[in-house]
């Protein structure tokens, strides 16, 4: 029977509980020398007290983590212009910079912060001397300033300054790449601390590890968090009743719902792209098999039927098929099942094992854990050509989760004999580590766009 439960002692209700300002600390482990140079000039602060957040530093870090940009260090900037009229275009183009972000911040009478910022096309500005003209509505030539890609003003409350910095990063990223930025997203993950009264904790943080919140704690294991497409809920596995069960929890209200509690194993929940179904794994018939569960009709449908183990389902972005890991060929490899016809195809052939697969939102690439002579590492496979690229050199990689724009991957690895979260750009150029200061971190799940 499906049960609706309030979390009670397991979840701290209302606003999510603040565990630490930044329990996950980003440490860059590999550079991006071939990335596109960009200038993020420190914003001018027109006040006497320190700002609650260094907006320009947050933006520079965001853009660097994408793997597509290499921000110029502040100590190597030829100047610090605070608006486009002060930009010396020749000075920046000599550094290879073709885009520059600058701005200013002041505080209004209500105590809020007024942020004025501009993204400048440095190359265009150099070509026109910042004085390009266009025909106005009356047919007269007017100054067009088409080297200013955007010029925006926003009023922001102090506690939301860091969030708004991510918003600016998204705008810059989309303007310069044509793709949506994913800096205003979150990650969910499980932290294990054997010395804590509740050693298993499900937490949520900004994608960069800041603003970490505790959403659930338990004396029994928690596993496999997965986001709903609207970013409101998490599906996860709990052992609180003595066996693996699947729950869905609203992370804002604290309400949760038990979905499955079949004999033996219930695991690996994953929302469908439309949010109407869960793919999951049950072993009620013996071996692990993939099922779908309709969240409206409560209908359970078996997808795989074999003597082998089939697990780790993940929906194709079009919702018409699932990929999953199976040992039907002897060792774990990744397969794809068409939900209409039931036909199954093997996707991975390189490496002795491939598991934990996810497909990028555009459907082009399969990201998975690939086992070779060098160990378990993240790899990316082109689904059209079959070409394989190993993305990481970390130890015992597992549980990859792709950003909603397909640009980055967060995963669990081993560092200093402890599970930590790591991050790699989808092209493998940028790598970082997000080590927790208070436990072993596993099973990351990247949120949808929020």
Curated annotation (Swiss-Prot):
Q: Which InterPro entries match?
A: 6-blade_b-propeller_TolB-like (IPR011042), PD40 (IPR011659), Tol-Pal_TolB (IPR014167), TolB_N (IPR007195)
Q: Which Gene3D superfamilies match?
A: TolB, C-terminal domain (2.120.10.30), TolB, N-terminal domain (3.40.50.10070)
Question: What GO cellular-component annotations does this UniProt entry give?
Answer: periplasmic space
Which species is the source of this protein? Vibrio parahaemolyticus serotype O3:K6 (strain RIMD 2210633)
Its localization reads: Periplasm
Q: Belongs to which family?
A: Belongs to the TolB family.
The organism's superkingdom is given as: Bacteria
Full protein name: Tol-Pal system protein TolB
Q: Which NCBIfam families match?
A: propeller_TolB
Matching entries from HAMAP family are given as: TolB (MF_00671)
Cite the record's note on assembly: The Tol-Pal system is composed of five core proteins: the inner membrane proteins TolA, TolQ and TolR, the periplasmic protein TolB and the outer membrane protein Pal. They form a network linking the inner and outer membranes and the peptidoglycan layer.
- One Pfam family of this chain: PD40
Biological process annotations from GO? cell division; protein import
Record keywords = Cell cycle, Cell division, Periplasm, Signal
The task this protein performs is described as: Part of the Tol-Pal system, which plays a role in outer membrane invagination during cell division and is important for maintaining outer membrane integrity.
SUPFAM superfamilies, per the entry: TolB, N-terminal domain (SSF52964), Tricorn protease N-terminal domain (SSF69304)
So which residues are the signal peptide here?
A: 1-22
């Amino acid at each position: 029977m499906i049960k609706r439960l309030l979390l009670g002692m397991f979840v701290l209700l209302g606003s999510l509980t603040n565990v630490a300002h930044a329990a996950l600390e980003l440490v860059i482990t590999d550079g991006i020398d071939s990335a596109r140079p960009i200038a993020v000039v420190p914003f001018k602060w027109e006040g006497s007290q320190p700002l609650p957040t260094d907006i320009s530093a947050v933006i520079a870090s965001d853009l660097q983590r994408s793997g597509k940009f290499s921000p110029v260090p502040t100590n190597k900037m030829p100047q610090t212009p605070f608006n486009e009229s002060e930009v010396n275009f020749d000075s920046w183009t000599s550094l290879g910079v073709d885009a520059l972000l600058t701005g200013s911040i002041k505080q209004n009478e209500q105590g809020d912060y007024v942020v004025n910022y501009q993204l400048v096309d440095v190359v265009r500005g150099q070509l026109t001397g910042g004085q390009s003209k266009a025909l106005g509505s009356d047919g007269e030539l007017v100054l067009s300033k088409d080297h200013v890609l955007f010029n925006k003003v926003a009023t922001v409350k102090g506690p939301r300054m860091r969030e708004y910095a991510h918003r600016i990063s998204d705008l810059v990223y989309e303007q310069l790449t044509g793709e949506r930025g994913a800096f205003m997203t979150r990650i969910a993950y499980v932290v294990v601390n054997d010395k804590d009264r509740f050693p298993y904790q499900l937490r949520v943080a900004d994608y960069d590890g800041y603003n970490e919140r505790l959403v659930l704690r338990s004396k029994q294991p928690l596993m496999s968090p997965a986001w709903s497409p609207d970013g409101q809920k998490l599906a996860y596995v709990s052992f609180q009743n003595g066996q693996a069960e699947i729950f869905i929890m609203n992370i804002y209200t604290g309400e949760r719902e038990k979905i499955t509690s079949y004999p033996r194993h219930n695991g690996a929940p994953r929302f469908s792209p439309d949010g109407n179904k869960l793919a999951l794994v049950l072993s009620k018939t013996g071996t692990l098999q993939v099922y779908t569960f309709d969240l409206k009709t409560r209908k359970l449908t078996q997808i795989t039927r074999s003597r082998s183990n089939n697990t780790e389902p993940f929906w194709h972005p079009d919702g018409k098929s699932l990929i999953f890991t199976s040992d039907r060929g002897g060792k774990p490899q990744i397969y794809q099942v068409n939900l209409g016809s039931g036909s199954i195809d093997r996707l991975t052939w390189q490496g002795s094992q491939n598991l934990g697969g996810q497909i990028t939102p555009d459907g082009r690439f399969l990201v998975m854990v690939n086992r070779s002579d060098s160990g378990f590492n993240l790899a990316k496979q082109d689904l059209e050509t079959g070409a394989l690229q190993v993305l990481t050199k970390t130890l015992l990689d597992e549980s990859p989760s792709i950003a909603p724009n397909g640009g980055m991957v967060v995963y669990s690895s081993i560092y200093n004999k402890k599970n930590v979260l790591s991050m790699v750009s989808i092209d493998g150029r940028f790598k970082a580590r997000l080590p927790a200061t208070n436990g072993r971190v596993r099973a990351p799940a990247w949120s949808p766009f929020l």
